[in-house]
Amino acid sequence: MKHYMRVCAEINLDAVAYNFKSMKDNLTPGTKMVAVVKTDGYGHGAVPIAQMVEAYDYIWGYAVATIEEALLLRKAGIKKPILILGFVFPDAYEEVVKYDIRPAVFKLSMARQLSEEAVRQGKTVHVHIKVDTGMSRIGFKDNAESADIVKEISHLPNLDTEGLFTHFARADETDKTPAEVQLSRYLAFSRLLEDRGVNITLHHCSNSAGIFDLKQANLD
């Protein structure tokens, strides 16, 4: 009888650390990095990677896809900010506020519910506004009407509009024009918010390709 083993991958954290250093060396001075560890760190182990880079001063925090992934990191002792890039269902808002998770906000109704939950718990919920500049997933449209909505969101009690972000759809292509157009739209929307007195602490949009090839997109 033959015995078979399941396929597995052995991850060398020294190699992962080297990759982080390579990314850092391409960052614009003063720009921090978000460690994206969704889907279990793309199969490399979200928890051990997050624990390894927690002490890196250039790591602002982490990004995941779901509330479950965020809670896994929190319960493993991760203290830095955790941003959920995808949709968060209302039944998870209590945990979002309780465990200080950053949700991506792209609807006024969502922001209102998060604000109400934060008031109920006596805490502040820090949100990152998602603007769609060309990826065509989730996000506010980059227009004046959306800017007015974000202004309303910024005035909700116990809610901090901490960040504004978008996602490049084609930054890894040789032709950088589509990504440059997205960056231009993002910056224009950011100015619309500034004109309305909306205070955003963190502006971010670069993915890996953006870090390497679009220095002008290395923001906060």
What is each PLM-predicted segment?
Residues 102-112, 142-148:
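Glycine-rich anion/phosphate-binding loops
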